[in-house]
Design a protein with these regions (language model features):
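Helix-biased detector of long, well-ordered alpha-helical tracts
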Residues: 1-207
Length: 207
């Protein structure tokens, strides 16, 4: 069976994360597998929320010349998961960036020049570029300023991965009109979660 101590640690972590995010865990279900059908704990969640009145950001508002910013270094989570699983014989102490993003997103809603924002989870920041191209016909030019921690880059260099495609679970990518970028970065730099925020690219007509 599964150790009670480990289960208690998981539940405590869940409670802490819910408190930090300002959400309630309203329901739950458990299932016990027969021996040999699986090991450990599998967690799946469904979030239910309410769209705030007047919230305008949408991919359709993105325009040529808009600027992309990110709240912090990319690829931490994807790399941390690989190291935790000890895949490819690699080990390390890199910590996942997993965390609530509401403190990052809410302040930007007051900016008229906010076009769109999203967390770069599955597929990383590169997937956001692909989605923008598919939805709007506009491309993304990423700049050399994209922040990647040295341990993340080292793992990617060894394994042939691109950090732009690695998942981030506590970051936000925001797209803004050029004259609102400085205001957005100032807001993020005033938060612990956004102190490493930087500009990372520009929207341009697809070539």
């Amino acid at each position: 069976g599964f150790e009670i101590e480990r289960l208690e640690r998981i539940v405590t972590s869940l409670a802490k994360a819910a408190q930090e995010a300002g959400v309630r865990i309203s329901a739950g279900d458990t299932k016990v597998l027969r021996r040999g059908e699986g090991g450990g704990v599998y967690l799946a969640t469904t979030g239910v929320g309410v769209r705030l009145p007047g919230v305008r950001p949408a991919m359709g508002r993105i325009a040529d010349g808009d600027i992309l910013i990110v709240s912090g270094p990319v690829g931490d989570h994807g790399t941390a998961v690989m190291l935790a699983r000890e895949e490819f014989g690699l080990r390390g102490d890199l910590v996942s960036d997993a965390g609530p993003v509401m403190k990052l997103t809410e302040p930007l809603l007051a900016l008229e020049g906010l076009r769109f924002m999203r967390d770069p989870t599955r597929g990383g920041i590169a997937s956001i570029g692909h989605e923008i191209l598919k939805a709007t016909g506009l491309g993304v030019r990423f700049e050399a300023t994209v922040p990647v921690r040295e341990p993340v880059q080292s793992v990617c260099d060894m394994l042939g991965y691109d950090p732009y495609y690695l998942a981030c679970e506590g970051r936000v990518v925001a797209i803004l009109a050029p004259d609102h970028v400085d205001a957005a970065l100032d807001l993020w730099h005033g938060l612990p979660e956004g102190r490493d925020a930087v500009r990372i690219g520009r929207i341009s007509a697809a070539e």
